[in-house]
From Swiss-Prot:
A zinc finger (C2H2-type) spans 222-244, 250-272, 278-300, 306-328, 334-356, 362-384, 390-412, 418-440, 446-468, 474-496, 502-524, 530-552, 558-580, 586-608, 614-636, 642-664, 670-692, 698-720, 726-748. This is Zinc finger protein 184. The gene is ZNF184. Residues 191-212 are annotated as: Disordered. The modification Phosphoserine is found at S117, S122, S199. InterPro entries: KRAB, KRAB_dom_sf, Zinc_finger, Znf_C2H2_sf, Znf_C2H2_type. SUPFAM superfamilies: beta-beta-alpha zinc fingers, KRAB domain (Kruppel-associated box). It comes from Homo sapiens (Human). Predominant expression in testis.
């Protein structure tokens, strides 16, 4: 910026002070400081000249608004913001050369004419020569080319015009002058932007100017000392230098954010006001900036004017092309000062820096969770709303984020474009490859501040931290159960929906979880390399062998904190805990009965369908449950390996022994909440509870009669089948019920 003590600045300050003088009769409007172009004249401007016109015009408008001299938005401002051409149909006055308006934009200042009334204002340019500063005169007259203009310029190098009267078509410079408090910008508003009627000589001069106007390209004499870039005009150089100095003189009063350009401040302030003046005719969407509307409209038109010379890929925005080209060049101009990591895109660089600062400015109103990126917040909010906008055409599954949808789609295509150079393993996502490569290096850069545990992945650390905080922000809308991880909630929801999206391509078996499918697929491809030394049973995974060996060792490392009962497997403990919590998430659609395990629901459904898939090879009898078949088969072998220590009675199943031992101990652990009656077996409690609810879930397929207990249904079905399974060993008579056999046996002597 120039020193305010310079002759130029003194002149401009003098003009500024005239604003408050008593003799200033008319306020400055935007019409006083605008240059109009015809379509033909506009085409003569090169891109640099058009950019300069846009920048200066928008800047002038900003300053007029800031001091209260402009209220409504002129059409030319809207045109410039939207990126359209701001030429007029018929010019009211002739305009000089293309260089003419540029010089006037930067240098034009006029002497005050306070006695001219509004009626006397004219849209004509009157140039009367009066004495002023040498350099100012030279710059002003430089662009006016008409007959004899070069000679006149040479003659006036040492003599300055005494007075310059500037009309509504002349724009003053805003680069110099006193500081405007609202914008923090050096602003000068000339108070003498008035007009008067042209003289005949002036009219003749204007005609001569129009007839002899030819575009003259100005030499790029203003050079940047930092990078060597040259500009035709010093105002453009001043704006460019802000990229080196970091100067941001335009400050927002709402949030204190500063900008290097005034038009950027205007656009930013619309964030606070919510003003979106640029509306799309196709979909009605509003935008803060005109260029944003232009870019958006290409979505509807499909226009992609920016094409990559390397690969031919086209883009709707020039910035996207620039970013894309860095893929070919490998350029990464944005480097982090903290860790030295480089990025090809500024947005990625800004997001990365939040890792070091810990900044998470985007907060969810529902659960108060914060995020480093607005896109992450938007995707997260869909968890609460249930919105799933991305639908797979293959299987119909919907997703709330594009990245999740893309990853899912690779399941159908089998695409795994990211391959490890060490072991050749391929992945469908680049992030998975990056994580996998740490298994070769052993790198664990993420440490827990609570316990010091290290992790290879940041996501693993984030999940681990929830163990310390106990945070469970993801809640199921069906049953209210909460989870620490979004993925756990997604998997849990499949319990309610019965969804099994992961199907084995070999045998067609479907699974609710991808991990289960991966494990299952190993049964087709992998050998069972892990063999039990006790019984010789082989397993695909070492973890499965370790679990199996607990059968032989009797190890039960998982203990219930409620009752102290121990279990061999963690899954068994989880299922057991549901007894204490009363949780029964698996509900039958036929009768509404709920179960705490999915397998119990599957077995229960066979009551309604009548399915008995387990058949005895000895006698052909079929059973609903595999365990029932196993129990039945022991009647053929007479095997009863489980003996009671009290009475030496033997049983074919350990569960029967456990139930029998309660006769000796009197233990009745299953208590009814309604009447406090206790039972030694859970099945007895379940059947008893039906007496309170009146529920009769067991239905006869023959006569549709219902029963509260399964044993009653079994006994009833013998009426239809004629089955009499209880035979007397003495006389061979058979009975439908065991109680009837017991009564009959009393008739024989010695019983």
């Amino acid at each position: 910026m120039e020193d305010l003590s310079s002759p130029d600045s003194t002149l401009l300050q003098g003009g500024h002070n005239l604003l408050s003088s008593a003799s200033f009769q008319e306020a400055v409007t935007f019409k006083d400081v605008i240059v109009d172009f015809t379509q033909e004249e506009w085409k003569q401007l090169d891109p640099g000249q058009r950019d300069l016109f846009r920048d200066v015009t928008l800047e002038n408008y900003t300053h007029l608004v800031s001091i209260g001299l402009q209220v409504s938005k002129p059409d030319v401002i809207s045109q410039l913001e939207q990126g359209t051409e701001p030429w007029i149909m018929e010019p009211s006055i002739p305009v000089g050369t293309c260089a003419d308006w540029e010089t006037r934009l930067e240098n034009s200042v006029s002497a005050p004419e306070p006695d001219i009334s509004e009626e006397e204002l004219s849209p004509e340019v009157i140039v009367e020569k009066h004495k002023r500063d040498d350099s100012w005169s030279s710059n002003l007259l430089e662009s006016w080319e008409y007959e004899g203009s070069l000679e006149r310029q040479q003659a006036n190098q040492q003599t300055l015009p005494k007075e310059i009267k500037v009309t509504e078509k002349t724009i003053p410079s805003w680069e110099k002058g006193p500081v405007n408090n609202e914008f923090g910008k050096s602003v000068n508003v000339s108070s003498n932007l008035v007009t008067q009627e042209p003289s005949p000589e002036e009219t003749s001069t204007k005609r001569s100017i129009k007839q002899n106007s030819n575009p003259v390209k100005k030499e790029k004499s203003c050079k940047c000392n930092e990078c060597g870039k040259a500009f035709s005009y010093c105002s453009a150089l001043i704006r460019h230098q802000r990229t080196h100095t970091g100067e941001k003189p335009y400050k927002c009063n709402e949030c204190e954010k500063a900008f290097s350009r005034s038009e950027n401040l205007i656009n930013h302030q619309r964030i606070h006001t919510g003003d979106k003046p640029y509306k799309c005719d196709q979909c009605g969407k509003g935008f803060i900036e005109g260029p944003s509307l232009t870019q958006h409209q290409r979505i509807h038109t499909g226009e992609k004017p920016y094409k990559c010379d390397e690969c031919g890929k086209a883009f709707s925005q020039r910035t996207h092309l620039v970013q894309h080209q860095r893929i070919h060049t490998g350029e990464k101009p944005y480097t982090c000062n903290e860790c030295g990591k480089a990025f090809s895109q500024r947005g990625h660089f800004m997001e990365h820096q939040k890792i070091h600062t810990g900044e998470k400015p985007f907060k969810c109103d529902e659960c108060d969770k914060t995020f480093t990126r607005s896109t992450h917040l938007t995707q997260h909010q869909k968890i609460h709303t249930g919105e799933k906008t991305y639908k797979c055409n293959e299987c119909g599954k919907a997703f709330n984020g594009p990245s999740t949808f893309i990853r899912h789609h690779m399941i159908h295509t089998g695409e795994k474009p990211y391959e490890c150079n060490e072991c050749g393993k391929a992945f469908s996502q680049h992030s998975n490859l990056t994580q996998h490569q740490k298994t070769h290096t052993g790198e664990k850069p993420y440490d827990c501040a609570e316990c010091g545990k290290s992790f290879s992945y940041w996501s693993s650390l984030a999940q681990h931290l929830k163990i310390h905080t106990g945070e469970k922000p993801y809640k199921c809308n069906e049953c209210g159960k909460a989870f620490s991880y979004c993925s756990s909630l997604t998997q849990h929801r499949r319990i309610h929906t019965r969804e099994k999206p992961f199907e084995c391509s070999e045998c067609g078996k479907a699974f609710s979880y991808l991990s289960n499918l991966n494990q299952h697929q190993k049964t087709h491809t992998q050998e069972k390399a892990y063999e039990c030394k006790e019984c010789g049973k082989a397993f695909i995974r070492s973890s499965s062998l370790a679990k199996h060996e607990r059968i032989h060792t009797g190890e039960k490392p998982y203990q219930c904190h409620e009752c102290g009962k121990t279990f061999s497997y963690g899954s068994s403990l989880i299922q057991h805990r549901k007894i204490h919590t009363g949780e029964r998430p698996y509900k039958c659609n036929e009768c509404g009965r709920a179960f705490n395990q999915n397998i119990h629901l599957t077995q229960h459904k066979r009551i309604h369908t009548g399915a008995k898939p387990y058949e005895c090879a000895e006698c052909g009898k079929a059973f609903r449950h595999c365990s029932s078949l196993a129990q039945h088969q022991k009647t053929h072998t007479e095997e009863k390996p489980y003996q009671c220590n009290k009475c030496e009675k033997t049983f074919s199943q350990s569960s029967h022994l456990t139930q029998h031992q309660r006769i000796h101990t009197g233990e009745k652990p299953y208590k009814c909440n309604e009447c406090d009656k206790a039972f030694s077996r859970s099945t007895h409690l379940t059947e008893h509870q039906n007496t309170h609810t009146g529920e009769k879930p067991y239905n006869c397929n023959e006569c549709r009669k219902t029963f509260s207990q399964s044993t009653y249904l079994i006994q009833h079905q013998r009426i239809h089948s004629g089955e009499k399974p209880f035979g007397c060993n003495d006389c061979g008579k058979s009975f439908r019920y065991r109680s009837a056999l017991n009564k009959h046996q009393r008739l024989h002597p010695g019983i």
